[in-house]
A protein has these predicted regions:
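Topology signature of small-to-medium multi-pass alpha-helical membrane proteins
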Residues: 1-132
Length: 132
């Protein structure tokens, strides 16, 4: 059983932001993989031979997998695992780099990932993560 009674607000806020990311990934994954008719107005990518690629389905499955990864990170964060911190840093940096490709909307992604890193690196979070 995970005891969050002593968790600092910075850890809870970081977990909440990661949970929002997980929900967003699950929603986008379901939209892309199960409801492609809703995206009928979007040009479907094709392979060089002209056959339609299953890029939307693959993107949807990848989003769902990332949603599960985010849930796993939250669980590990509440268990005070150092692997969770490494995963948070790694995925935040990757998300920020991909946010650069989507400017100006990517600025929101970059800001939220900086916020998660800032929250996890706070003094109260470091003390809580180092305690047994």
């Amino acid at each position: 059983m995970i005891n969050l009674r002593n968790a600092p607000p910075s850890i809870l806020a970081a977990a909440m932001l990661i949970a929002v990311g997980a929900v967003f990934n699950f929603a986008m994954g379901l939209l892309l993989s199960l409801a492609p008719q809703l995206l009928a107005g979007i040009a479907t990518p094709t392979t060089p031979s002209g056959a339609p690629a299953q890029l939307l389905l693959i993107s949807g499955v990848a989003c769902i997998i990332f949603g599960f990864v985010f849930v796993w990170i939250i669980k590990e964060l509440f268990n005070k695992s150092h692997l969770a911190i490494v995963m948070i840093y790694t995925l935040s940096i990757i998300n920020m780099l991909f946010g650069l490709f989507r400017l100006p909307l990517g600025l929101v992604t970059i800001f939220l990932n900086f916020l998660v890193i800032f929250l996890v690196r706070s003094e109260s979070a470091k003390r809580w993560l180092s305690s047994n």
